[in-house]
Amino acid sequence: MNSIGVYIHIPFCRRKCPYCDFYSINYSAGKADIYTEKVCSSIRYFGESIRRNADTLYFGGGTPGIIGADRLCKMVNEIKENFGFSENPEITVEVNPEKENIDFDKMRKNGINRISIGLQSANDSELKILGRLHNVKQAELCIDRAKSAGFQNISLDLMTSTPTQTKYSLEKSIEFCAKKDVQHISAYILKIEQGTPYYNIRETLDICDEDEQAEMYLFTVEKLKEYGYHQYEISNFCKSGYESKHNLKYWHDEEYIGIGTSAHSFVNGKRFYFPRSFEDFYNLKTVSDGEGGSPEEFIMLALRLSEGLTEKRYKNRFGESIPEVYKNNAAKFSKLGFLEINSDGIRLMPKGFLVSNYIISEILG
């Protein structure tokens, strides 16, 4: 049977950022100990029931790095014992730069081989407005320490169209990432989500309008290309061979198990998730989220990738060519330069990514 990806949600943060709508709570060592034990028992449960090796493991949050290397490595070893790892697994941990005592050496020695650092900006005033707890100097130190521990696969998160950001300051942030010679960069357009502090003060925030957001996004794509980072997904860029294997599972509509509060899963054709509740997670109470793996879902996810919806992948999955109706629906967008249709399939261009939700809904009819 095919390998599976594993996602573990670590919901702890020192302080919640004003733009963030992910599930998180304030960190305490006691809560982290209890949560770690519950994750480990869940790993044992799912390992027994799923019986598939893990080829990717991703610790997301929240702020996974905040709980320390000992707890993280304990969970890695539980996966190793109860799932088993495929050859050369990708094991990622998200960290924030403000925590200066992250034990990268221990992480590396226990099989963790990819670090994702929440930089967001290389401008101290922008970081302060974003409610981040680190400064640029701390971010640089964090990257250097990860490298010194032997990490050769480091990703940085950037945000575009943030309050007071200019094209010049964005260019400097991109330049910072490139000069640090990291392998992967995720660049996200700031979205003001309902229920966040930013949403409550949205009228007072100095942020870009939609046209300016589009300009900043396309500028980001071009600058990263100049520095040798190819775009492989709407918001993700990397040097050759350093695509996030775990995230590609989502976009290739492959199966994964999510463990922890708010974690989603796609296993044996079924989608389900844990609610945003410690009690429900501790009792392994999941909520069904319907069937997964339909042609429509496959197409929607594939079109997020720069390679797009390929004939090869579609045929391997469904045993037939991409239905002509989808190509016909895509034709008008090809004429407008938003996407490309050829014998290999359908793929969006960078300006098409900006309106991808609309284009994909039109293609699917």
Where are these regions (language model features)?
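C-terminal scaffold of the Radical SAM
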Residues: 3, 24-46, 55-320
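A short, conserved structural fragment
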Residues: 334-344
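Minor-groove-contacting beta-hairpin "wing" of winged helix-turn-helix DNA-binding domains
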Residues: 345-349
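Short, amphipathic alpha-helical interaction segments positioned at domain boundaries
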Residues: 351-365
